[in-house]
Amino acid sequence: MKNYIQYLTIGALLMGSLTSCNDFLDREPLDKVTPEKFFSAEADLAAYAINNYKFVTVDDKYGINLFGKDNDTDNQASGTSNSFWIPGEKKVAADRGEWKWEDIRSCNYFFDQVLPRYEEGAITGNQDNVKHYIGEMYVNRAYSYFQLFTKFGDLPIVTTALPDIQGELVEASKRQPRHKVARFIIEDLKKAEDMLLNNPPGGKNRISKNVAYLLHARVALYEATWEKYHRGTAFVPGGSGWPGKDAQGYDADVEINYFLDEAIAASKFVADQMVGNLAENTDTPEGMNASLVSINPYYTMFCDENMEGYKEILMWKKFDESLGVTSNLQMELCRNGGGSGWTRGMVNSFLMRNGLPVYASGSGYNPDWEKEGVVATVQNRDSRLGIFTKNSIGEYEVNPAFISDVERRYQFALSAFNGV
């Protein structure tokens, strides 16, 4: 009997130790924040939102970078050929190519977690800022959708982070006609416009109300002109050869007018604020004097270190070597123009100083100037052409006042895309 009691005691102790062990293991990790706890404060939303900024910007890679996007258009050309224009060479990717939904899923996950808590008033912090960061995420989703939209047109409209269940994924993957996708993007931006602050925490390094309106105008104008100039083709709902199953009552005139009206209204909201607030172009060949004081605000707006003071700049990226946010673009442009340059048509789109186009009678333009080189070609033009045109190859001066142990800033006596 005594042994039996001993066995029971030992067994009870073992069971107790196992239970306490399970209790010890069944705890939230101390080195990580769980989803249930993360979206509970203003700072959480701020961090998540800015981590989902996917805007195409200048990075630290060598080359012309972002500004090569216009290559192979009527405005800009590179020194290499592009197979895009060769029949049969523009092929569908063998894998998923650009069909990537990770960014949109990240936004949808945010809304799944945050919107119920926001409606319950369960997120701590400054409520104006909380509301603002939710607005930022609507812009993030709209932007990510717009990036896909310009590549594919018809898209699935997905508003939640879907589970890994085949049936649900297949149903949600059905593509909607492009005009419905564009309307969905604009609806997201309207939600953002209602929630965003004019002057957000972080200044113009973060999304603001005006940024949402700017993107709103761009999306609307893009879709209006696309549907207008592709009417009746396979690239719009119901057009000849359109691969969609159901145009769902698509009316080209109604859609085109809707998107044009949206573009006009959104543009006007921003433009009205800029009246009398644009940077002045004082028409000087240099942007700063010897003391590095701006003598041409329009010029220095494109090469300043701090863009907060320029009303017409709605959002900008701050480069900071200590934070590892750097760029090699200026060096590349100075050295060889980044292997890219403006087309003759682009240059000749700039007016003469007297306000007349180069082809007009009385403009004063001489076509023979083109034979003499860039300097002669751009003479007597709108001064903005000279600011953004490198007019001498391999010839520039560095102002020593720009160089210190802390920072390297260069002023080129001969413009080399100084504004970029």
Language model features with spans:
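C-terminal motif of bacterial Sec signal peptides marking the signal peptidase cleavage site
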Residues: 17-20
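Bacterial N-terminal signal peptides that target proteins for export
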Residues: 1-8
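Hydrophobic helical h-region of N-terminal Sec-dependent signal peptides
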Residues: 9-14
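Short edge-strand/loop segments of extracellular domains
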Residues: 161-166
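Conserved, well-structured interaction surfaces
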Residues: 40-58, 77-152, 168-209, 374, ...
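An aromatic- and glycine-enriched ligand-binding surface/loop that stacks and positions planar moieties
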Residues: 22-83, 155, 159, 210, ...
